[in-house]
Amino acid sequence: MKSATKSKILCIHGYAESGELFSVKLRALRERMADSVDFYFPTGPIELDKAKDELNGSGFDALSTVFSSSPASHRRGWWRINEYADTKQLEPTKAFEYLASYIKEHGPFDGILGFSQGTNLAANLAALVTIPKYQEYFSQPPFRFALFFSGYFRPLLMDGAVHATKLDLPTLHLLGKYDTVLSTETSTTLVRACKDAQVLFHPAAHQIPAPHAYVEPAADFIDFFSREDWPIISKHISLIVPTKKVNTTSAQTSLNNVEHDLISKIMSRSFKGGINVVVSDLQMFNEYKRIFGPKVLSLVVTDGQEPDTYSENVHYTPNFKGALAYLEAYQNSIGRIYVIGDKKLLTLGMLCRCTKRIIAITDAEDKFISQSSAQQVSGSLPFLEHSKEWLKAKSSQIRQWTGQSRLKHMSQDNSGEPVTMKLQMWERL
């Protein structure tokens, strides 16, 4: 792919770091997207000194702990943390001037990415360039998307005033479950400032997590929002996550039938707006097609595979974008929309501003069970594994949604031991 066709992302490093160091930390993502994205890493204009800039008195004192892990040559910042006390507003003039010069030389950019202190600067910059005056100053049109690692938000001054405190663009927030530098409450300030926020928890602290915990969903997010304007569906799209089929014993077959009946009730529930649609890949369609009744239209994403036979009442499309285009064209005659499929479909469904509900089968400890291996899925979709951290509907609401009152049935784990499976539903934040 030619460089001219690549998307460009501006990456803003954290406190007491540098663009060079941040580039190293994002190596896995850079390599994953080398053919489609160019990442740019400016270095903050403020040279930091451990003796002067690791001071108390700031609401973000804990950020100074990064000094212990940053080489002296990489200790740069966008402003000094002791200049930004809880009661003080800050105008980081040097940071804005430097970024304006940097963007003029290397931009404009499609997206913006930040870590820690860099998320606050990135969020404020993204808000500013929605204003024509500052689009001209920074030589940057509104960003199409943003990714925030360990983020927080406090308004920064520009020309002596706060101009925007809300972000109306797709954002992906990656938060460490064990972050002791920024509290969940502090991180929530940025989530709440974003109109279209997607949140993924990863099993790490205040850091860029291990590649398996973020690269695939981040790459899917960037690919979706950077390439072109994809179809937007006004209706809610729900994910259905089935249990993993571990064996084919008669007992397991019976239990699978219970789950099939449960999913059938969910998908075939009548809706006055039109016929229900279920989006799946070929494997999932072949497994569940017998339970799709006349009230359900199957929309199958072939992804380069050729169906053995072409079934009636089924629309085949080569990719997920084609599925969205079909749903957009016929959404006035569609009732409810469901996605049931492998990790790729689930991730795309979650990150494409479509999904409002997740319907999943879990074990008694709320551990997510999937068609993919637990390690793969917990890396891409860790919030499902830690369901208690997310808003869940009441049992009465779940019963109304599923059309039946029995929310549990018995299944087996990989060793054949019996486990209690539970139907649960999450609302997207």
Swiss-Prot record:
- The portions of this protein that span the membrane are none
Q: Where's it found, cell-wise?
A: Cytoplasm; Nucleus
Query: Which named protein is this?
Result: Uncharacterized hydrolase C22A12.06c
User: Which principal EC class is assigned to this enzyme?
Assistant: hydrolase
Q: Which terms are listed as keywords in the entry?
A: Cytoplasm, Hydrolase, Nucleus
Q: Which SUPFAM superfamilies match?
A: alpha/beta-Hydrolases (SSF53474)
Assigned protein family? Belongs to the AB hydrolase 3 family.
Taxonomic lineage is: Eukaryota, Fungi, Dikarya, Ascomycota, Taphrinomycotina
For the keyword Protein biosynthesis, the answer is no
Active-site residues, record numbering mapped to chain: S116 (charge relay system), D179 (charge relay system), H206 (charge relay system)
UniProt-listed Enzyme Commission number(s): 3.1.-.-
Presence of keyword Nucleus: yes
Q: What does UniProt give as GO cellular component?
A: cell division site; cell tip; cytoplasm; cytosol; nucleus
Domain of life from the UniProt record: Eukaryota
A molecular function GO annotation = hydrolase activity
